[in-house]
């Protein structure tokens, strides 16, 4: 197969997995992938998953890749809070949650961290256009904050809660405190319910 034929078929997907290729071609020489990677046409994201090098300079491509590199997953926690202006830090790692085991990946698009949550709380996200029409799964700010409090067990005092450094003005405009209290019990974790109550007290929401 010639590279141009391959590109014409799969470019719209953003990245290409062995499984995706197999759904179109019953016979495919996988050595093509190594050859095209060595030639700079493709970028290896992880074992069995490749992206077109053309996408490398596309704004938002790192975010769009997050839910493709490890699925099912959605962007959450620090990355979403930073993008919403809720925390002051510039988050360089793409933080996501998944129902699969915890994992980390690094490639030319960035560093990716995936942490495990229960399947019954794998909700509270939406599909958004992130790069050249490519969709990605992104948590709402409220869900991102709940995931953060659930996955980090050290926010148990007022001082520790202040260390999240939430912008109080943005917080009051973005997240309803009662919404956090209503959603927290679905995690079936009393510690999270307690952290939400503490957060509401500390930040006045």
Annotate the PLM regions.
Residues 125-205:
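Hydrophobic alpha-helical interaction segments
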Residues 1-72, 108:
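Short beta-edge/loop segments at beta->alpha junctions of small alpha/beta modules
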Residues 26, 85, 150-154:
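Hydrophobic/aromatic-lined pockets within catalytic cores
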Residues 31, 75, 140:
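Short, well-structured alpha-helical interface segments that form or flank functional binding sites
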Residues 3, 18, 77, 141-142:
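Structural motif detector for alpha-helix initiation sites
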Residues 37, 43-52, 62-121:
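Short gly/ser-rich loop at a beta-strand->alpha-helix junction or flexible surface loop bordering the NTP-binding
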């Amino acid at each position: 197969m010639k590279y141009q034929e391959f590109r014409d078929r799969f470019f719209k997907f953003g990245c290409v997995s062995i499984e995706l290729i197999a759904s179109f071609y019953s016979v495919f020489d996988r050595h093509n992938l190594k050859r095209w990677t060595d030639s700079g046409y493709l970028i290896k994201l992880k074992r069995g998953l490749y992206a077109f090098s053309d996408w490398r300079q596309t704004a938002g491509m790192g975010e769009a890749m997050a839910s493709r590199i490890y699925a099912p997953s959605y962007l959450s926690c620090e990355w979403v809070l930073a993008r919403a202006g809720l925390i002051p830090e510039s988050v360089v790692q793409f933080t996501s949650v998944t129902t699969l085991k915890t994992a980390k990946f690094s490639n030319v698009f960035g560093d990716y961290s995936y942490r495990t949550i229960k399947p019954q709380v794998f909700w509270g996200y939406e599909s958004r256009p992130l790069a050249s029409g490519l969709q990605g799964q992104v948590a709402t700010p409220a869900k991102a904050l709940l995931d953060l409090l659930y996955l980090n067990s050290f926010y148990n005092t007022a001082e520790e809660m202040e260390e999240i450094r939430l912008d109080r003005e943005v917080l009051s405009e973005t997240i309803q405190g009662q919404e956090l209290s209503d959603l927290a019990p679905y995690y079936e974790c009393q510690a999270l319910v307690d952290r939400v109550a503490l957060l509401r007290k500390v930040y006045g929401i």
